[in-house]
UniProtKB/Swiss-Prot annotation:
It catalyses: UDP-4-amino-4-deoxy-beta-L-arabinose + 2-oxoglutarate = UDP-beta-L-threo-pentopyranos-4-ulose + L-glutamate. Homodimer. Catalyzes the conversion of UDP-4-keto-arabinose (UDP-Ara4O) to UDP-4-amino-4-deoxy-L-arabinose (UDP-L-Ara4N). The modified arabinose is attached to lipid A and is required for resistance to polymyxin and cationic antimicrobial peptides. Pfam families: DegT_DnrJ_EryC1 (PF01041). Pathway: Nucleotide-sugar biosynthesis; UDP-4-deoxy-4-formamido-beta-L-arabinose biosynthesis; UDP-4-deoxy-4-formamido-beta-L-arabinose from UDP-alpha-D-glucuronate: step 2/3; Bacterial outer membrane biogenesis; lipopolysaccharide biosynthesis. The gene is arnB. InterPro entries: ArnB_NH2Trfase, DegT/StrS_aminotransferase, PyrdxlP-dep_Trfase, PyrdxlP-dep_Trfase_major, PyrdxlP-dep_Trfase_small. This is UDP-4-amino-4-deoxy-L-arabinose--oxoglutarate aminotransferase. Its EC number is 2.6.1.87.
Amino acid sequence: MSEFLPFSRPAMGVEELAAVKEVLESGWITTGPKNQALEQAFCQLTGNQHAIAVSSATAGMHITLMALEIGKGDEVITPSLTWVSTLNMISLLGATPVMVDVDRDTLMVTPEAIESAITPRTKAIIPVHYAGAPADIDAIRAIGERYGIAVIEDAAHAVGTYYKGRHIGAKGTAIFSFHAIKNITCAEGGLIVTDNENLARQLRMLKFHGLGVDAYDRQTWGRAPQAEVLTPGYKYNLTDINAAIAMTQLAKLEYLNTRRREIALQYQQALAALPFQPLSLPAWPHVHAWHLFIIRVDEQRCGISRNALMEALKERGIGTGLHFRAAHTQKYYRERFPTLSLPNTEWNSERICSLPLFPDMTTADADRVITALQQLAGQ
């Protein structure tokens, strides 16, 4: 059998090794100059005013919700077809996640679904830029402005995604992820961008014990050795080891995403003759980052179920992913919201399958996946 082809693999090279070595030899390995450089680079990439690096996108979501004073009695609108960390953070703060349906073919939350879910208790809206494509953020942001509700963009899949000519996160507040499978990675990490100066100040405090400054800031600017706690906070800062890797990856972003697009195009062309259904692309002008390439496997149409397809691909040495099992179908949320029905979400959650997609894949790797799909479709 051929070597196992994983669903994803980080594209690491000698540049990342050199970046880590530089930090280790510098004597400053926790939050420091590499963090500052990463934050500045994301301001430049997105065009936004403030960037706050954190230990994960989940940490970023947690403190953003906290900074917006979301808590008991509040509601936060989000799709169910997302990673559960968003729902978990809302719930842990005592608020209620209001899960809404998505478009059946793009899997994007729609402005109409969001607006229909608004109540006097709605405190925030969290749209997801799904799989590397952008949601219709202008329309969603307009709803937030009309009702006076904060919009927090889940941009975990969207490093390199553009909407109407502007990078995701160009305005408002957005949260990116640097997890191991993301378009750029530093193993674990995240970053928040915002154009709200007061929010940025609160986020910097909340990510580091509630202090007004961090250790590097104190050393650099000669401030008092013991900073003062301004509010209870967390330990969500990113180390310079991670930031250095992220910076190196960011310098490669154009190449990394170009390679993803090439593989995605190869899949698209082959799937045109197969019963497996890829996602539709959004109608608005955009640049897709191709974080994921997802097909829908309908047993009646394809002659095989999604789970059986994933197992058959595994037997052929090909890994796959599931992004995502709908949150409202998982035990805790199923029991908390027993009557919730989201037809488009449920139909897709039972059928979606993420194919291997990462920059170091070869054309032959993609051909191997395509050949396996052809065989499993009986062609």
